Amino acid sequence: MSESLSTSNDPLSQPSEPPTDIKALDFFRDDRLVADPAPYYEALRGQCPVLREPHQNVVMVTGYEEAVSVLNDAETFSSCTSVTGPFPGFPVPLEGRDDVSELIERHRDELPLNDQLPTFDPPVHTAHRGLLMRLITPKRLKENEAAIWNLADRVLDGYLVGGEGEFIGEFAGPFTLLVIADLLGVPEEDREEFLAHMHQRPQEGGGIGTTDGQSAAHSPMEYLYEQFAGYIEARRREPREDVLTGLATATFPDGTLPEVIDVVRVAANVFSAGQETTVRLLSSSLKVIAERPDIQHLLRTERDRIPNFVEEMLRTESPIKGDFRLSKVPVTVGGVDIPSGTTLMLLNGAANRDPRRFPDPDTLDPTRSNARQHIAFGRGIHSCPGAPLARAETRVGIERLLDRTTDIRVSDRVHGPADARDYRYIPTFILRGLTHLQLEFDVTEPNTESDTEGGHTA
């Protein structure tokens, strides 16, 4: 049985007063901003949509148009520090130079996570992104979506037993991990090992962007590197008619065969990043469904509303709080002059609540007509290639949970009464998501039409 998460003095749970003092609060270190950063975002944007915060010297971009303009400008802005931002800092001073492009390339290998696709710039990024898009083709995504329904039911079979369960650890985590494993062709006999190894990661910190100031670690990437290197090398020696052989023989856009490590990096990044963010999206979606009977009723009776509900969840609860960019040359963003060598944080979660783009932005509206204009998946050359998969996983997960239950509720025993909930959030300035979500549900009778036919059209 899960213990109560009551944490009245815990900064990782909801604060009693919204923290908005920009001068007093360090976004990258203050746990008071973890549970609900929206008031802080609004305070930033209220001063200026492009504003330098005083603690880490980062220019915070909270405006929608301003963020999109930066995301679309890979010529002016480098992604070399896109994951870690100002930490641990650039190896050499960048101030006072007209163009820091040469310094970036000279010291790129000294930066954290420099072997990961999100930190690449053109032309290296162009080649590796091209390789990635040869792995995640529309045909492969369609094949994978057909398997998503079965995988959802497979995990739900165990999760729904007993009438309650911890959603993130018992459903969202295993489900999304198995979906990614299927997409990348991990052999069926190896998937339980992947599940055991990858799903034992700590839920409450220790990863990239933690507010405790710990440096970024590569685990569990090292495990993924080892596994996929073995797969790729084996398929190059002995090709088969399977997805892994497609991975092993995929070429760069110019037709050259990548080194094994290049393929491994792309596959491992898709596996790790895609699984983590979709878990957060699924859990935030189910929290709303369980907390809001009106929305649950709407989605149960009008299933065609689910895709737009997912978009609205991406807008209001962006799983990635933001991405970083480093200005290579002096530039103006939203009327604000930015010197070369400046770290900017593009706050997706703030831009997605910009009232200039989204009227009444703090209201979650499943019928919002422009919900899909959010930038939760980024824009430009680094936009998330797995966005169609994340959308499909979340839609299918919601549909099958609704098919197989008649009511879903948040556990009062674990999270407290409805008027005084306690939720804990991951203490990072990168990810936005719950650490636990205990749900209770009334399960439908087996062998209903939706169960036997899958409740969907593929």
Describe each PLM feature range.
Residues 1-458:
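Cytochrome P450
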